[in-house]
UniProtKB/Swiss-Prot annotation:
Pathway(s): Carbohydrate biosynthesis; gluconeogenesis
Family: Belongs to the FBPase class 1 family.
Subunit details: Homotetramer.
GO biological process, one term: fructose 1,6-bisphosphate metabolic process
Chain sites annotated for binding Mg(2+) 2: 106, 109, 280
Cofactor note: Binds 2 magnesium ions per subunit.
Record keyword Hydrolase present: yes
Keywords on record: Carbohydrate metabolism, Cytoplasm, Hydrolase, Magnesium, Metal-binding
Name this protein carries in UniProt: Fructose-1,6-bisphosphatase class 1
Organism listed in the record: Psychrobacter sp. (strain PRwf-1)
InterPro entries according to UniProt: FBPase_C_dom, FBPase_class-1, FBPase_N, FBPtase
Keyword Nucleotide-binding assigned: no
Length: 334
């Protein structure tokens, strides 16, 4: 088996590529610590609420705070990291002014799953620091998803998995999306899949149907067509899947296809969506597109969105290309 270290040694020794590799290595090392804490569960006193809200107005779990602090400490110590932005913190944290990279992360996606031993994960996005030599500020992070140098996630489930992709400009070996599994015997992430591709068609979809009454008409139409099955306009039966953690649903799509949807709804008309553009939608969109899928906010490509705030929210439809394009067509025609 090829370890993560061996895999990275096969890449060209270009300065920017090596900097990105070093940052990904730092993140995966923290992921091993989070994996150990999750395995201990209640024995490590990581269950339950932390007793505070994050900037999103969400109740923080104890492990939300722990994972955030571990990542923040490790990344600010990395010489290549000029600044860090976390879903859990109001503002970006400056790190090393001479660093050439910015890192955004969701320290523990799906943290409501912690106490019931269901999948959670860490999502990350790496951007260039275009004001090298100056302290990183929130505005430095406001780059389109197309500017990402790399993105990925760590999934903490029955096994710990790492999936990531380098941008086309850095992926000299043309390996697209790659996936590693943590070997508990060696403590090393080992390569299990590369050049992952997503089928353009699917029979599986992931959406929280409890919000159906709040969806916009085009989304209601789309899901009703799927529910009609083989006797409806789609002429085939679909299955619903829902992990309650974006990282788990995207992992399933990379492994066996499907479409993931967290649409805009009318519960709070002032919000464009539920998920965060910079910490969740952009990194997952890069992964999905590099695997041959598509990603949209139901009207436009997510990675073309011009961010105005590091905590900006967005609707998300991603996965099987033909399904995503059909959802977008319904919304554009509405």
């Amino acid at each position: 088996m090829t370890s993560l270290t061996q895999y990275f040694e096969q890449h060209p020794k270009l300065p920017q590529t090596q900097a990105v590799i070093d940052v990904i290595t730092t993140i995966t090392n923290v992921g091993k610590q989070i994996t150990d804490l999750l395995r201990q569960g209640a024995l490590a006193d990581i269950h339950g609420e932390a007793g505070a809200e994050n900037v999103q107005g969400e109740q923080q779990k104890k492990l939300d705070v722990i994972a955030n602090d571990l990542l923040l400490e490790a990344l600010t110590a990395n010489k290549h990291c000029a600044g860090v932005a976390s879903e859990e913190l109001d503002d970006a944290t400056p790190a090393n002014e001479s660093g050439e990279l910015l890192v955004l992360f969701d320290p523990l996606d799906g943290s409501s799953n912690i106490d019931i031993n269901m999948p959670t994960g860490t999502i990350f996005s790496i951007l260039p620091h275009n004001n090298k030599g100056q302290a990183a500020q929130n505005a430095d992070f406001l780059q389109k998803g197309t500017e990402q140098l790399a993105a990925g996630y760590l999934l903490y489930g029955s096994s710990a998995m790492l999936a990531f992709t380098l941008s086309e400009s850095l992926d000299a070996n043309n390996e697209g999306v790659v996936m590693f599994s943590l070997n508990p015997s060696t403590g090393e992430f080992e390569l299990v899949k590369n050049n992952i591709t997503i089928d353009a068609d699917t029979k599986e979809y992931a959406i929280n149907a409890s919000n159906a009454r709040h969806w916009l008409p085009p989304m209601q139409q789309y899901i009703n067509e799927l529910l009609a099955g083989s006797s409806g306009p789609r002429g085939k039966n679909f299955n619903t899947r829902w992990v309650a953690a974006m990282v788990g649903d995207v992992h399933r799509i990379l492994c066996r296809g499907g479409i993931f949807i967290y649409p805009k709804d009318t519960k709070d008309p002032n919000k464009a969506g539920k998920l965060r553009l910079m910490y969740e939608a952009n990194p997952m969109s890069l992964l999905i597109e590099r695997a041959g899928g598509a990603s949209t906010d139901a009207l436009n490509r997510i990675m073309d969105c011009e961010p105005t705030d590091i905590h900006q929210r967005v609707a998300v439809v991603l996965g099987a290309k033909n399904e995503v394009e059909y959802v977008q067509k319904l919304h554009q025609q509405a």
